[in-house]
Amino acid sequence: MTKSAHTTPPPDAAARRSAPPVLTYSVEQLPPFDAGFYNRARAELSKVASLTVPARDARAFEVAAGHFFRIVSVEGPQVGDLNLWNSHDLAERFYSGKTRALHATHLSTGDRLWSSFPKLRPMATITHDTLDWYGWDEDGAGVHDVIGTRCDPYTRLLLKGMEYHHCCHSNLTRALAAERNLPLEEAEVHIHDVMNVFMCTGNTRDTHQYFMKASPVRPGDFIEFFAEIDLLVALSACPGGNCGASHSDDTAKCYPLKVEIHRPRESALSGWQSPAPNKYSRSHGTR
C-alpha cells in the first residue's frame, strides 16, 4: 500500500526529514545478560518432559522457574506461535510490544521476553538459538519476530469471507481452555500477541508493510529459553507451515514441533532468584 501525498511539501520539508533518529529506549540500565551463568546452568541438563505439538494445532504446558525449555524442529520447516503466562496469574502475560521496544523486532540469544503491566519483568530469557547465524538478510528480514500478532479467524473472515478454525489464535485458545479447564470464551481473552518462533519476516522497504518468507529452520534446529518465573506456555504449529506462501488455510505443508523441558543441576542455580515485579508505585500522579 503506497501512501500518496495530498499536500504540498513545505519549504523546509527536507530539513524536517533530516532529523537524526534516536533510540526510543536507553537500555543500559537493564540487567545485563549473564552468559556465564546461563551457560553453566545449561551445561548439565536432565530432560524431565517432552511433548509434540501436532501440525495446525497447539498444546499448553507448565515450565517451573529455573528450568529450560526448547522448541525443536523435528520433521520439516515449521513456524510456531508462542504465548507465555505467569502460571499462577494469567493476567501477567507476555508483552510483545514492550519486548520489541526494549530489544528489537526479532529476538535471539540474550534477549528476554517481558511481561505485561504492572509486573513488567523478564518471564523468560533466550539462552540458545541455532538460527542466530541468520541475522538480517538482503530483504531486511530476520528470524523469531515480535512484529506479527498471530493468524486469527477474525482477520481471515474479514479478508477472505470464510471461516477457518485452525489459525494460531484458535489453536492457542483451544490449548489454554483444555489445559486450564476453561470455557472457550474465557480462555480466548487471555490469548495475546505472540513471539513468532522460527518465522522469517520484515517490513518492505518501499511501503513498510509486514512480509514473511520461507523460514530457514530445518530439522534439528531449536531455540532454548530459561524460565525466569513459573510459566504456563502455549505453542501453536502455524497452519502456514514455513510461512513462505500462505497462512490461515490448509494449503501449506505443515509439520509438528517438539518441546523439551530440561532441569539444570540445583547447584548451578545457586544465588539465582526470579525477577521481582516492577516496583512502580502505581499512584499515577494521584499522591
Model segments located where?
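Acidic, Ser/Thr/Pro
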Residues: 2-287
